[in-house]
């Protein structure tokens, strides 16, 4: 396999004016979509409406991201500090696995918070190999699926939808 020598590139999320970060695991797939709008009006003396093009829509990308705070350091994204935490965490007995997965899911979830100075959430760039996407996080839901004995969330799936930003200049 010629790809065995190529290091795995992690998806990076770069919030405008904020600190960029890598996802812990790359998504298995993503869905890219775009819509156009058509207006319908009833024609005179016809059984079918008259259809007229009404405008284009922005592109959107949907991802399902996996987060696991019990992983070992070599298999996850993040910086050196994150990898060291994960490695140490994977060696602890179950009761000691206390890295709250929300530490990592909140980095994404907070991309929907409104910047008080700009009055909008931050514009983000998604970078993953040849995928380069600029837009806003418009929808996000988190399903927590594993917990420590104390009830701390340890694993989660996150469904995210990003909508393309189109500059008013274009």
Q: What spans do the regions from the language model cover?
A:
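Acidic, Ser/Thr- and Gly-enriched intrinsically disordered low-complexity segments
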Residues: 1-170
């Amino acid at each position: 396999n010629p790809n065995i020598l190529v290091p795995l590139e992690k998806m990076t999320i770069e919030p405008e004016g904020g600190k960029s970060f890598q996802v812990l695991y790359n998504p298995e797939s993503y869905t890219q979509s775009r819509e156009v709008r058509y207006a319908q009006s009833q024609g005179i003396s016809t059984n079918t409406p008259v259809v007229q093009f009404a405008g284009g829509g922005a592109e959107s990308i949907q991802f399902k991201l996996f987060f696991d705070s019990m992983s070992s350091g070599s298999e996850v994204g993040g910086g050196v500090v994150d990898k060291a935490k994960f490695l140490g965490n994977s060696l602890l007995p179950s009761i000691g696995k206390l890295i709250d997965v929300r530490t990592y899911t909140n980095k994404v979830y907070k991309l929907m918070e409104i910047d008080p100075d700009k009055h909008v959430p931050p514009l983000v760039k998604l970078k993953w190999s040849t995928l380069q996407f600029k837009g806003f996080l418009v929808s996000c839901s988190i399903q927590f699926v594993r917990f420590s004995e104390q009830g701390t969330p340890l694993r989660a799936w996150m469904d995210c939808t990003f909508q393309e930003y189109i500059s008013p200049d274009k």
